Structure formats: C-alpha cells, structure tokens
Regions:
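Conserved CoA-thioester-binding segment of acyl-CoA-metabolizing enzymes
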Residues: 1-56, 71
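C-terminal alpha-helix plus adjacent terminal tail
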Residues: 1-8, 42, 56, 162-168, ...
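Terminal peptide-recognition signature
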Residues: 14, 18, 32-33, 51, ...
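Hydrophobic alpha-helical membrane-association signature
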Residues: 29-32, 185, 226
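An acidic, glycine-rich surface segment that forms the CoA-thioester-binding/catalytic face
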Residues: 30-42, 65-102, 134, 149
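Short, active-site-adjacent cap segments at secondary-structure transitions
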Residues: 56-60, 106-107
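Crotonase-fold acyl-CoA enzyme core
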Residues: 89-204, 235-236, 240-241, 248-250
Length: 257
C-alpha cells in the first residue's frame, strides 16, 4: 500500500508512503487515496483528517511522470477527468482536512495541500507548481485554488514561472497557516485537529460547506446558504447539547448527531 491510512481516535491520518520517490503520486496511489478518502468521509467516528508524507524530504513531489504519463495520455483526449476522484477533484468532503507539510510540496503535492483547509509547514518545506516547465498546467485544482488563497499576482508568479518558494515566503503570502520545526509538523497538525474536534463536528462541516460553496456564489446567495446551514445546525442534537453545556458551565459531549 502506498497510502498508509490509519485511524487515531477521531482522526484519519493519510501518509503518502513512497519516500524513495519523494512521495510522488502514481496511478496506484491515486486509486488508494480515493478509496481511503471515501472511507474517511463515510466513517461517522472520524471528524478530521491529516495528510503527510513519509520521510523527511517530501510531503509529495507531485505526479510520478513516468508512471502517470501513459495513463494520462490514454484518458485525457476522451475524458480529461477520469482520474480517481479525490479531495482535489470530484470528491466532496466537508470534514476538515489538514496538510502536515514535512518537505517538498510540488505540483500535485502542492495541489493536494491546497485542497486541505489548513496547512502546517516544516521550516524545510518548499512549494511550487512547476508544470509549465513541462509544457503543461496544474490539473488537480492548482489554477483555481491558488488564486483563491493568495493574492492573484503571487499566484500568477508561481503558476507562470514554476518557481519554488520556501516555508517563510509561503507563510508571508498566506499559503500556510504556520511554520514549525521539522520534528513538530505532524504533532502540531494533530494538536490543531484535536482542537477542531472539541467543537461540534456537524457545525464544523456546515461552516466548511458554507465557506467553500459560498466562494462561487454572490453575497446574497451565500448569505442564504449560510442561513440554511445555520438552520440545519440548530436542528441537531449537538446544538442542544452545546447550549445545554454552556448554561451548565461544562464541556459539551458532542456525538455528531
């Protein structure tokens, strides 16, 4: 197995385990990632997910060109996105996702991180979308997510040149949430995930859905979506428990119901 998928309490941990190839994604890895994400999405006991890479050099160096190229050439002309659906494209996951970026995040690796909600970076991490240097463009959401996350001029700089930036520059432009020592990347991601899991899980998913879907809506439509999702949250058992716990001055015991 290339995707090492483990469950730790309320967390789903996804580790790309190809350190000898800088954790590049091949066809097998893409299929395994799809299967793991579907299981994560559908498991009611899992409330948050973390992505990371095996070893110290790379989070994910993108697509394994030698392995993926024949596959892509076969499917792209007829159906550009017959790739296995993941959080990057084709699979909607409203549970929060955190990228623990322990090294290189290049091409599809950066796109995987962009498809997460929170990004924790190692001091040694480097980021880039070098696809244009191969005569290609990012195809796993990079052209769409990057300019939604950072200023358009900085997105253009990365997209048009394929240049790499370090962790501090990524933090400066708002690409990552925080930068930590290499040995603290995964533990920090778990701390953030555990903090998220203290909140009502259905409310967190509703907030994520409102945020993501609202980006493609007018303000008026986004406000209506927010109102609808707030109504949903207020109908849950978790909301009743949360308000009761508040009045009783205790921690709520949320059940994702």
């Amino acid at each position: 197995m290339i995707i090492d998928y483990k469950k730790e309490g309320k967390l789903g941990i996804f580790t790309i385990n190809r350190p000898e190839a800088l954790n590049a994604i091949n066809v097998q890895a893409a299929r395994e990632l799809h299967d793991a994400l579907v299981d994560f999405r559908d498991d009611p006991e899992l409330w948050a997910g973390i992505f990371t890479g095996a070893g110290e050099k790379a989070f994910c160096a993108g697509a394994d060109i030698k392995d993926m190229l024949p596959f892509l050439k076969e499917i792209l002309p007829a159906s550009p996105w017959k790739m296995p659906a993941t959080n990057m494209r084709g699979l909607k996951i409203w549970k929060p996702l955190i990228a623990a970026i322990n090294g290189l995040a290049l091409g599809g690796g950066l796109e995987l991180a962009l498809a997460c909600d929170i990004r924790i970076a190692s001091e040694k991490a480097r980021f880039g979308l070098p696809e244009v240097t191969l005569g290609l463009i990012p195809g796993w959401g990079g052209t769409q997510r990057l300019p939604r996350l950072i200023p358009a001029c900085k997105a253009a700089e990365l997209l048009f040149t394929g240049k790499l930036i370090d962790a501090q520059e990524a933090y400066r432009i708002g690409l990552v949430n925080t930068v930590v020592p290499p040995e603290a990347v995964l533990s920090t991601a778990k701390e953030w995930a555990q903090q998220i899991c203290q909140a009502g899980p259905l409310a967190v998913r509703a907030a994520k859905q409102a945020m993501i879907r609202g980006l493609s809506m007018t303000l008026e439509d986004g406000l209506k979506l927010e109102n609808d999702l707030e109504g949903y949250a207020m109908s849950t058992e978790d909301f009743a428990e949360g308000t009761k716990a508040f009045t009783e001055k205790r921690k709520p015991d949320f059940k994702a119901k």
